[in-house]
């Protein structure tokens, strides 16, 4: 006896043809295609694939959450050497910030992030703890969230920010003091309305605003909407005299440069476009009558002439 029948006989309910037909497994007189219905259709396979995809997505999300939780847990497990590097061990809040427990005596060490990451996080904690609204702290936090920038880049950003903060602090000094201090450095300086101005190249700059050489004047700049392509085949435009790659513009700026707006057209072109629209609406010219222009008959030509002259006579022009 085959194993399947043996299993059926040993089970409590012995399957009969009538019972299987009731389930829809065998064809009957009433339902001859019952056995075909049980084979999975394309729709069933699609639904199954969708369910599998959703399950995999959920697994991936769970894994991401677990990784982030582990990172957050290992964040505070810094060794004492990194504390001494930043001279935070003498501050009263360093133990509170680091929450250092007893170090493991065995040679086994748990996973620790790379030193640059430790340094960044230490800096971020230090800056944020001193002042919640500190722009450097906020910058560090955003960069940590990005998790893609090297430490050197972040350090240059911090230096720039610190320079900007110093410039803001110096702004409180009078213009005369600024002029005297800058003259001592041997630069060409003049007094401006709000601050001293330094001459770099052929332009006057406020202190802290010079961003490198001012490349393009409005005369030799490329067209502001179409732009040009440089030697690297990158499309670029000028923004306030600086070369800016098209791909680095914001979406709104790119959208604004997608086509020339009305202000790029001359007044004659604007009038011509308006007249074309007017003719299309009131005289029925345009693409609709293109077959009449190609295969024109005598009657159609006479009718068009009469229509045209009557429109001229009765002042149907857009500007009359």
UniProtKB/Swiss-Prot annotation:
Membrane-crossing segments per the record: 45-65
Segments on the Cytoplasmic side according to the record's topology features: 1-44
Keywords, sorted A to Z: Glycoprotein, Membrane, Signal-anchor, Superantigen, Transmembrane, Transmembrane helix
Compartment(s) where it occurs, according to its Swiss-Prot or TrEMBL record: Membrane
Record-level GO cellular component terms: membrane
Stretches of the chain found on the membrane's Extracellular side: 66-319
Membrane topology (UniProt): Single-pass type II membrane protein
Known glycosylation sites: 79, 89, 93, 131, 146
Presence of keyword Cell membrane: no
Keyword Transmembrane helix set for record: yes
InterPro entries the record matches: MMTV_SAg
Note: This protein is coded in the long terminal repeat (LTR).
Sequence similarity: Belongs to the mouse mammary tumor virus PR73 superantigen family.
Purpose of the protein: Superantigen.
Descriptive protein name: Protein PR73
Organism: Mouse mammary tumor virus (strain BR6)
């Amino acid at each position: 006896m085959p194993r399947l029948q043996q299993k059926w006989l040993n089970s409590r309910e012995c399957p009969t043809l009538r019972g299987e037909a009731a389930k829809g497994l065998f064809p009957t007189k009433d339902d001859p295609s019952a056995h075909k219905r049980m084979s999975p259709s394309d729709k069933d396979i699609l639904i199954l694939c969708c369910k599998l995809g959703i399950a995999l997505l959920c697994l991936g999300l769970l894994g991401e959450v677990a990784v982030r939780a582990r990172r957050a847990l290992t964040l505070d497990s810094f060794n004492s050497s990194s504390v001494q590097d930043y001279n935070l061990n003498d501050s009263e809040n360093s133990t509170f910030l680091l929450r250092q427990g007893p170090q493991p005596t065995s040679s086994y060490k748990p996973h620790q992030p790379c030193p640059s990451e430790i340094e960044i996080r230490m800096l971020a904690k230090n800056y944020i703890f001193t002042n919640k609204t500190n722009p450097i702290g906020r910058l560090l936090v955003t960069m940590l969230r990005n998790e893609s920038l090297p430490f050197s880049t972040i350090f240059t950003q911090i230096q720039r920010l610190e320079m900007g903060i110093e410039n803001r602090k110096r702004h409180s000094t009078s213009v005369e003091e600024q002029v005297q201090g800058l003259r001592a450095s041997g630069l060409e300086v003049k007094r401006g309305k709000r601050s001293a101005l330094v001459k770099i190249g052929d332009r006057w700059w406020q202190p802290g605003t010079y961003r490198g050489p001012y490349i393009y004047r409005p005369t030799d700049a490329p067209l502001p909407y179409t732009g040009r392509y440089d030697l690297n085949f990158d499309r670029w435009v000028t923004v306030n005299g600086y070369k800016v790659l098209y791909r680095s513009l914001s979406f709104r700026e790119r959208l604004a440069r997608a086509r020339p707006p009305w202000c790029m057209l001359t007044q004659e072109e604007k009038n011509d476009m308006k007249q074309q629209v007017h003719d299309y609406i009131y005289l029925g010219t345009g693409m609709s009558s293109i077959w009449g222009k190609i295969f024109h008959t005598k009657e159609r030509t006479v009718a068009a002439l009469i229509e045209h002259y009557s429109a001229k006579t009765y002042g149907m022009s857009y500007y009359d």
